[in-house]
């Protein structure tokens, strides 16, 4: 409880007083309830009530003070850090990684200084990640490195990965690119060097004794080395809810630590001797595997459990967790926002709090085979259930069958672990014994892959929830608390009515699970919404009609890698969009379709792709159409004058709003060699809102459309043609549209000079308010207003 109070203090500083003080008041209320409802200890608790409340208040404000100290320390030097600033950094390497063709060295206990004579005073700073082309040092080395500052970027689109928040939560303030290690001191680092060599040798041995896919998974699971982890397997495990097995956590620490601890105890070693032997071993394993936050939590809890045995006491899981949470947050209060830490803590809370109330209250020896199986199932539910809101908060989707998959996966983990460890150790000596020893792990991992691929084919395997509003978290965890209280009451009243108790328990479990799942998956009704995504040099536009029909326009980029996987899909999932009814493609340039190709390959549901009739002969478009058909997506061809109607039905079952998309260009007789001259152009109408979307058409085509449609082009919103190029957005075109708002989608730095000053001046002269994705990030139109900086 004290750990929760301490956490509340940090939450108040990190996320706002409303959340932090609300959590604090909840903690105090729980303390009062415990003091006046726990019969066995009511008198003792009442006498200590004042002490509990006083300590809670002290911890709450101590946490706030600690957060402020750390935050002020960070601000004191980050205000002087700018991108590409030349600096010198001194620090100790705590972890090394090889990723995307370069080495990353994580430095702690850092000091830094500018390389210019005017700012070369040395000052303390937070942790730093150094990017190098070659492995110039090892873990444990104290180094001096020169380089240029790389500030981590914040997310500029809803759902996009926020690098700044991610690194900040781990205490890393900036990166050092083009880094060069000038000097290093290694005389006391022999221990770290030995562990790194052991890790590297074991990882290389796994590559020698088995295939690359299996070696990548085993290296991640056993050694914390994700350099060779197959992205397809990583995504597959995530979608099916078993990605936790890839991280070094309590499960892995338990397998290693408990195995040695029990072996020593069986051989007659005392509690103290076992503790003194296993503790250095488990600490060394933690350092070797990268010492992630979840690993620190697991190692700390395991050591506390062994220490309790040394003093003749029984270790308490929740108290150990609380102690480690306070230790971790004291060291780095920003860890409160780290996903791995949150998952780790919530999983243990599920085991320690929810599981005892989810399983039957029957002695193990009195349980039937069916009851044992039932308890295993509900134990899995109890662990997974509290984690679902956290999963939805981070991935905007939940794996429906995760409970069943984990029931089959977790019991086989020791087989993988033991087989992998022995195979990697033997492989360091000779390949043949390693190849034999790795076979059990190989076959179990193949079973995992087969199981996961089967599960994702089942209906509803992956439910897109969207970003959860605060009220859903409140309702979900309040519902879970009510369930625990209800079962507690049932257990008190069961006495001799065991049969009646079991029936009520089954009903309560099912009702609770169904209710909590409904809280997560039921989506509120939506209103019309337009989003122009920040995809760098490219286009990506989402629109939701009042009727609920959801469409997407283009989707590509030439400067942002994997724009479909990293920006478009996360945005759609963040907004709870399970499928796109119509995906419009203006033309087949890469900055308009690269992301769409990725979305198709991901298996995301698209009902129709809409292209211009005249685009059939375009080679790149033909390739896209072929890919669409491969994934079962229907392709619609439009020409000038064609209309796609969406109906909006009011409460009286009457169609009361015009919702349509009218194709303006090209017609069947139009033909130009340049793709830009043949862009699919259309007008979108949704009740009192309208918009013009014309891809990359030049001013000549704009003039042609003005002469054909005249005042029919008038619209509220205009997506600037060709990213605001010099030869688009002509004066006559803008006068015909007369837009209130104009969005320009382009990269901050591009070789085309977008947006051109001439185009910007013409748009401003037309009286339109301009929004730039390169400055504002994602641009959102909702409830008759435009919003910037959706971050």
Task: For each feature predicted by the language model, list its residue ranges.
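Membrane-interface helix/helix-cap signal primarily in integral membrane proteins
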Residues: 56-244, 566, 570-573, 579, ...
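Membrane-helix interface and helix-disruption motif detector
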Residues: 12-22, 42-46, 339, 399-400, ...
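Hydrophobic alpha-helical segments of integral membrane proteins
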Residues: 191-210, 217, 225, 233, ...
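Hydrophobic alpha-helical transmembrane segments in multi-pass membrane proteins
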Residues: 37, 231-402, 465-525, 703, ...
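Non-globular, low-confidence helical/coil segments that flank catalytic cores
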Residues: 90, 113-116, 131-148, 165-167, ...
């Amino acid at each position: 409880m004290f750990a929760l109070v301490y956490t509340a203090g940090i939450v108040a500083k990190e996320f706002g007083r409303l959340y932090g003080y609300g959590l604090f008041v909840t903690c105090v209320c729980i303390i009062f309830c415990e003091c006046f409802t726990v019969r066995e200890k009511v008198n003792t608790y009442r006498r200590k009530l004042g002490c509990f409340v006083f300590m809670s208040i002290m911890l709450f404000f101590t946490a706030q003070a600690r957060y402020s100290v750390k935050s002020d320390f960070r601000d004191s030097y980050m205000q002087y850090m700018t991108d590409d600033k030349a600096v010198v950094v001194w620090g100790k390497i705590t972890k090394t990684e090889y990723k995307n063709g370069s080495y990353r060295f994580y430095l702690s206990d850092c000091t830094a200084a500018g390389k210019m004579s005017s700012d070369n005073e040395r000052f303390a700073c937070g942790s730093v990640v150094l990017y190098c082309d070659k492995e110039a040092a090892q873990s444990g080395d104290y180094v001096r490195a020169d380089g240029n500052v790389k500030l981590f970027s914040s997310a500029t689109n809803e759902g996009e990965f926020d690098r700044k928040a991610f690194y900040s939560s781990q205490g890393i303030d900036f990166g050092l690119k083009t880094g060069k290690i000038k000097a290093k001191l290694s005389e006391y680092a022999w221990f770290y060097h030995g562990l790194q060599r052991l890790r590297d040798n074991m990882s290389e041995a796994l590559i020698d004794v088995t295939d690359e896919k299996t070696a990548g998974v085993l290296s991640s699971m056993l050694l914390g080395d994700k350099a060779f982890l197959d992205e397809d397997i990583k995504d597959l495990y995530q979608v099916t809810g078993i990605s936790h097995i890839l991280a070094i956590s309590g499960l892995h620490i338990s397998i290693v630590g408990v195995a040695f601890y029990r072996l020593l105890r069986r051989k007659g070693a005392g509690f103290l001797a076992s503790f003194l032997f296993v503790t250095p071993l488990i600490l060394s394993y933690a350092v070797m595997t990268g010492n992630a936050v979840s690993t620190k939590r697991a190692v700390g809890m395991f050591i506390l459990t062994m220490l309790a045995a040394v003093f003749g006491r029984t270790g308490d899981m929740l108290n150990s967790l609380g102690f480690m949470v306070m230790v971790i947050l004291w060291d780095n209060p920003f860890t409160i926002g780290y996903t791995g830490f949150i998952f780790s803590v919530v999983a243990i809370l599920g085991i320690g709090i929810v599981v005892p109330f989810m399983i039957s209250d029957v002695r193990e020896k009195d349980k039937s085979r069916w009851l044992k199986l039932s308890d295993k199932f509900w134990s899995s539910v109890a662990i997974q259930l509290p984690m679902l809101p956290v999963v939805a908060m981070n991935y905007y989707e939940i794996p429906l069958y995760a409970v069943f998959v984990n029931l089959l996966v977790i019991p086989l983990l020791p087989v993988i672990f033991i087989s992998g460890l022995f195979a990697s150790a033997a492989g360091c000596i000779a390949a043949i014994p390693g190849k034999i020893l790795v076979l059990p792990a190989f076959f179990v991992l193949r079973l995992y892959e087969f199981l996961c691929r089967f599960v994702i084919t089942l209906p509803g395997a992956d439910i897109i929830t969207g970003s959860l509003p605060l009220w859903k978290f409140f309702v979900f965890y309040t519902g879970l608390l009510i369930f625990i209280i209800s079962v507690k009451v049932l257990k008190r009243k069961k006495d001799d009515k065991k049969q009646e108790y079991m029936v009520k328990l089954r009903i309560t479990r099912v009702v609770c699970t169904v209710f909590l799942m409904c809280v997560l998956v039921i989506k509120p009704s939506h209103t019309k919404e337009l989003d122009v995504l920040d995809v760098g040099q490219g286009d990506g536009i989402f629109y939701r009609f009042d009727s609920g029909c959801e469409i997407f326009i283009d989707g590509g980029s030439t400067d942002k890698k994997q724009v479909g996987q990293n920006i478009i899909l996360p945005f759609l999932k963040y907004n709870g969009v399970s499928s796109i009814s119509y995906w419009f493609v203006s033309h087949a340039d890469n900055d308009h379709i690269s992301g769409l190709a990725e979305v198709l390959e991901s298996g995301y549901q698209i009902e129709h792709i809409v292209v211009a009739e005249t685009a059939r002969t375009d080679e790149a478009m033909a390739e896209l159409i072929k890919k669409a058909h491969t994934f079962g997506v229907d392709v619609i061809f439009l020409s000038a004058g064609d209309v796609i109607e969406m109906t909006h039905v009011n409460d009286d079952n009457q169609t009361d709003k015009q919702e349509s998309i009218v194709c303006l260009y090209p017609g069947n007789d139009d033909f130009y060699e340049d793709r830009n001259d043949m862009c699919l152009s259309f007008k979108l109408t949704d009740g009192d809102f309208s918009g013009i979307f014309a891809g990359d058409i030049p001013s000549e085509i704009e003039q042609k459309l003005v002469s054909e449609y005249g005042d029919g082009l008038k619209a509220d919103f205009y997506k600037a043609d060709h990213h605001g190029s010099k030869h688009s957005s002509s004066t006559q075109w803008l006068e015909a549209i007369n837009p209130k708002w104009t969005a320009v989608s382009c990269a901050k730095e591009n070789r085309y000079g977008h947006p051109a000053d001439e185009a910007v001046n013409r748009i401003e002269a037309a009286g339109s308010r301009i929004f730039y994705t390169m400055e504002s990030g994602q641009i959102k139109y909702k409830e008759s207003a435009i919003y910037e900086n959706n971050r």
